[in-house]
């Protein structure tokens, strides 16, 4: 627990007056800090500052341990829902045959359906580097074949002796 969070509870509250909210949500009005602490102590609960920037600051009477547990639970749930997107790679050659292309296309479809991004790359070997237009045609063919279920994130570009593009899965909005 950080020091900043500690200072928002019970004796850590520095404000002279607070707008007090009871544990059931009832507004108790503006009270002195000592009076609010006494009310919280009588209820065997904690006084927690929920809106420190308000004038006067808003404090609520609650079980701080339970509140912290609920916050941690919400944070864990939020982290679970975050998806880590990985980039998968499909390698092609400039002189790729139709059946080989279809196989690589199925691999790209599988990766995109799982929610991963796909980097499609063509490696030019030897003198093939002089035929960049053929490589661009192959990548454009891949874009056309996957346009129903993907969007182009990075259009074909050269990087050394290879040309690549990045496809991302289409999001339903």
Curated annotation (Swiss-Prot):
Belongs to the IF-3 family. It is found in: Cytoplasm. GO terms for biological process: ribosome disassembly. The keyword Protein biosynthesis applies. NCBIfam families: infC (TIGR00168). GO terms for molecular function: ribosome binding; translation initiation factor activity. Disulfide bonds: none annotated. Pfam families: IF3_C, IF3_N. This is Translation initiation factor IF-3. Keywords: Cytoplasm, Initiation factor, Protein biosynthesis. Monomer. The gene is infC. The keyword Transferase does not apply. IF-3 binds to the 30S ribosomal subunit and shifts the equilibrium between 70S ribosomes and their 50S and 30S subunits in favor of the free subunits, thus enhancing the availability of 30S subunits on which protein synthesis initiation begins. GO terms for cellular component: cytosol; membrane. HAMAP family: IF_3. SUPFAM superfamilies: Translation initiation factor IF3, C-terminal domain, Translation initiation factor IF3, N-terminal domain.
């Amino acid at each position: 627990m950080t020091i900043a969070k500690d200072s928002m509870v019970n004796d850590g509250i520095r404000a002279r007056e607070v707008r007090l909210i009871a544990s059931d949500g009832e507004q108790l009005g503006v009270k002195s800090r000592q009076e609010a602490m006494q009310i919280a102590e009588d209820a065997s609960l904690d006084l927690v500052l929920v809106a420190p920037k308000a004038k006067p600051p808003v404090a609520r009477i609650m079980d701080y341990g339970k509140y912290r547990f609920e916050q941690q639970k919400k944070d864990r749930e939020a982290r679970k829902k975050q998806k880590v997107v990985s980039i998968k790679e499909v390698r092609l050659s400039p002189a790729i045959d139709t059946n080989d292309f279809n196989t690589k296309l199925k691999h790209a479809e599988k990766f995109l359906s799982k929610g991963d991004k796909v980097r499609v790359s063509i490696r030019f070997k030897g003198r093939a580097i002089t035929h960049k237009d053929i490589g661009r045609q192959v990548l454009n063919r891949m874009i056309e074949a996957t346009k129903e279920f993907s969007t182009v994130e990075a259009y074909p570009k050269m990087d050394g002796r290879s040309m690549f593009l990045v496809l991302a899965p289409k999001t339903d909005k």
